[in-house]
């Protein structure tokens, strides 16, 4: 559970879902635990439920809110690959959340259009992605750990790697790890381990710098100072653009086509070696961040008008 890495960035919550994460549990088990925990604190409440993104928690809390007759406010609404199996279960989570939500905050024009095609046109707002605000604020504050700053010297050139997607597990991970090993012969690699992928160190070469998950500030520091990124993450596709770093996306689809359209990203599945030079070219098509700016202020302004 990576939530601890974010806890120092936000105020202590009034309610917290307790003991819902367990390694190896099924999606159904997690969903049930979330609903039961939400019942303990929020049943019969009239809170507006704000959910972000497409995680199992976001969808399940949307379902809870619907059953409890609470309004659902969805931030990062309208992202689509149009393939329910990729990513799994995130694509289904966001589709179902959209059809439950009362208010939709979309990051891009593409996401607004995705909702329109599904017949969702009321209370849809194009605001950008809050990740832009988070990135800029954290980088400007410069509150990074001594440990991560010592890991990366001023003239250090490295590639940053993260992998965790459910659809890449088993055979595909091994293929990607073999490619990463090949890349490591000529490039320093910092590989951030993920709790859901415990076997990575069995397959990776000793010369690869394997580190445990870092807090969000340090993660952005590693992104900002990297030479390029190799990942199957969704959020990293946005953070790469904010940092003006290129990213090889180890997937066959993306719900963030703006990263590719702007020249910062490329879908490569497991074919890292053949596409490695993409990270080092300078053909950025559009230097304007497609994910917006001052997003949080826009959202707050709309919420104040909607619920005054």
Residue ranges, per PLM feature:
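Short N-terminal targeting/anchoring amphipathic segment
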Residues: 40-56
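Donor-nucleotide binding loops and adjacent catalytic segments primarily
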Residues: 6, 143-225
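A nucleotide-sugar donor-handling region in carbohydrate enzymes
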Residues: 1-3, 97-171
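Conserved nucleotide-sugar phosphate-binding/catalytic loop shared by glycosyltransferases and other
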Residues: 1-33, 37
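Leloir-type glycosyltransferase catalytic cores
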Residues: 110, 266-308
């Amino acid at each position: 559970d990576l939530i601890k890495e974010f806890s120092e960035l936000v105020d202590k919550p009034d309610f917290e879902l307790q003991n819902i994460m367990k390694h190896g549990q099924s999606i159904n088990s997690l969903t049930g635990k979330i609903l039961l925990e939400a019942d303990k604190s929020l049943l019969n409440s009239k809170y507006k439920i704000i959910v972000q993104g497409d995680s199992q928690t976001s969808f399940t809390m949307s379902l809870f809110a619907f059953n409890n007759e609470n309004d659902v406010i969805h931030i990062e609404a309208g992202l689509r690959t149009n393939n329910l199996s990729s990513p799994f279960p995130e694509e289904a989570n966001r589709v179902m959340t959209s059809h439950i939500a009362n208010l939709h905050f979309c990051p891009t024009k593409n996401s607004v259009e995705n909702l329109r095609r599904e017949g969702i046109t009321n209370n849809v707002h194009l605001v950008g992605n809050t990740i832009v605000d988070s990135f800029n604020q954290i980088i400007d504050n410069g509150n990074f750990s001594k440990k991560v700053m010592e890991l990366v010297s001023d003239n250090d050139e490295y590639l940053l790697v993260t992998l965790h997607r459910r659809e890449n597990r088993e055979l595909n991970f091994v293929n990607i790890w073999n490619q990463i090993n090949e890349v490591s012969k000529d490039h320093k690699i910092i590989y951030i381990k993920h709790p859901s992928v415990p076997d990575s160190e069995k397959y990776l070469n000793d010369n690869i710098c394997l580190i445990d998950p870092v807090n969000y500030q340090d993660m952005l520091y590693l992104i900002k100072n990297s030479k390029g990124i190799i990942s199957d993450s969704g959020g990293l596709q946005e953070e790469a653009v904010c940092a003006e770093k290129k990213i090889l996306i180890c997937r066959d689809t993306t719900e963030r086509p703006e990263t590719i359209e702007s020249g910062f990203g490329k879908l490569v599945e497991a074919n890292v070696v053949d596409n490695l030079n993409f990270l080092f070219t300078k053909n950025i098509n559009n230097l304007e961040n497609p994910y917006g700016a001052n997003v949080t202020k826009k959202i707050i302004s709309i919420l104040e008008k909607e619920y005054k």
